[in-house]
Amino acid sequence: MTNKTLDLSVYFIAGAQNFSECSLDGATQKIALIIKSGVTVYQFRDKGTIYKEQKQRLSIAQKLQKVSEEAGVSFIVNDDVELARELNADGIHIGQTDESVSKVREKVGQEMWLGLSVTKADELKTAQSSGADYLGIGPIYPTNSKNDAAKPIGIKDLRLMLLENQLPIVGIGGITQDSLTELSAIGLDGLAVISLLTEAENPKKVAQMIRQKITKNG
């Protein structure tokens, strides 16, 4: 791990599957460009289903980790604890159906950031004492970026959930440019986005917009 602080404000999530029209090299290049556009965190969310050989996935993860390090961006691995350990990533992010936070913490140690996804109020309550370093709450709005996404929380219930929270929070799910102002006013530490950046004509402009909204109201 090289990044000792975690700025959650512009949290980018993607894998090669988010650029299905591209070759693996093309997808990797597009992700690298977005990493260098001003994001603060990059989460390598790549389930490995599109590779002929798993060593291709490791190679791409290593390339994107290097890009992240050079850009001063925290590199976090989604779900795959062994990959996070092999890469000595800055962090690991897990969901409610993965191994428990305590078990993952035993494997990765105290030096690696550990994020946990939360989809409803009772999960948020339990997460407070789980040992996670930060939480990803969502989906806030309906989203097409994740096939197995839970029911949208909505801005009203999200506000109520945040009143009971003591941990750094990243909002995720269906975030568009039109929703940035609404989201910036409720006390989130960052916004996690996929399509808002992968489909942007100017990722740098979008990343700057997110950061300005979050830091202005943070």
UniProtKB/Swiss-Prot annotation:
UniProt keywords, alphabetically: Magnesium, Metal-binding, Thiamine biosynthesis, Transferase
Annotated HAMAP family: TMP_synthase
CDD domains: TMP_TenI
Protein name: Thiamine-phosphate synthase
Essential cofactor(s): Mg(2+)
Cofactor binding: number and manner: Binds 1 Mg(2+) ion per subunit.
Residues that coordinate or bind 2-[(2R,5Z)-2-carboxy-4-methylthiazol-5(2H)-ylidene]ethyl phosphate: 143-145, 174, 194-195
Protein family: Belongs to the thiamine-phosphate synthase family.
Pathway, per record: Cofactor biosynthesis; thiamine diphosphate biosynthesis; thiamine phosphate from 4-amino-2-methyl-5-diphosphomethylpyrimidine and 4-methyl-5-(2-phosphoethyl)-thiazole: step 1/1
Pfam family name, one: TMP-TENI
Record-linked InterPro entries: Aldolase_TIM, ThiamineP_synth_sf, ThiamineP_synth_TenI, TMP_synthase
Function statement: Condenses 4-methyl-5-(beta-hydroxyethyl)thiazole monophosphate (THZ-P) and 2-methyl-4-amino-5-hydroxymethyl pyrimidine pyrophosphate (HMP-PP) to form thiamine monophosphate (TMP).
Any Gene Ontology biological process: thiamine diphosphate biosynthetic process
Keyword Magnesium part of the UniProt annotation: yes
